[in-house]
């Protein structure tokens, strides 16, 4: 059974919400009796609203990918600090598998609950994951399209505010910061920027390594070896642009070494709606269901 439910304004057709996909199925409201054990669900409710629904689904035997942030952070104290709520189900926080196949593929396959990464963490972590455990300090400068701000209209995402402008926001206060730090195991300096495009995200990561500088060839080989078995991460030779991955589930990463100071710079691009949200959720659902990982994503 395929149900598509909405927390706000149900009883519309999907084609009226996203006409580009030509899907005429109607949005409904969630009814627990409509789900069966063994079903799969992807939950994209707002932060703090997703946790009760996810708990009900998991308790009924449904395997869930949670696209909200409600199960990403392992430290329970982080939820009131960064998201403004006390988590109602610490047991599910402890059980949830972080939904990054490039690191947790085998655990995702057997999970009851997968926490889909946030868009900024997805790009940042993929950019730095081959160096995890070797990073002394890192600065991440990230730029995202307007769709990353969600559907709720605010002054900052009006056309007249965004067009022909680039601006930083939530400096030293963005709630994706602890998620990046959790997965990389190092404190990060993270600054996000809003850019006047619909979809796409570029994270430029400047890292100093604990074991000293690497040669450019050694760095590229490190990345090529690490991502050789991961179908949606492409290691490229020149800094990629957002256009290369828009409307896809791919990430492109380009690692380079500063020949003067030895610092590693990694450019990482994703589609914030694709690999940064819905595409990643489908990739995780495929793994959980024992389907080909790239089914529906090529």
What does each of the following model-derived ranges do?
Residues 2-6, 11-19, 32-34, 38, ...:
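C-terminal substrate-binding/catalytic lobe of Rossmann-fold NAD(P)-dependent oxidoreductases
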Residues 2-21, 27-169, 256-260, 295:
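N-terminal Rossmann-like NAD(P) cofactor-binding subdomain of oxidoreductases
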Residues 119, 211, 272:
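Residue-level signal for short, function-critical loop segments
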Residues 123, 215, 276-277:
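Secondary-structure boundary/capping motif
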Residues 130-134, 208, 284-291:
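Active-site catalytic microenvironments for nucleophilic, acid-base chemistry
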Residues 252, 257-298:
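NAD(P)-dependent Rossmann-like dehydrogenase/reductase catalytic/cofactor-binding core
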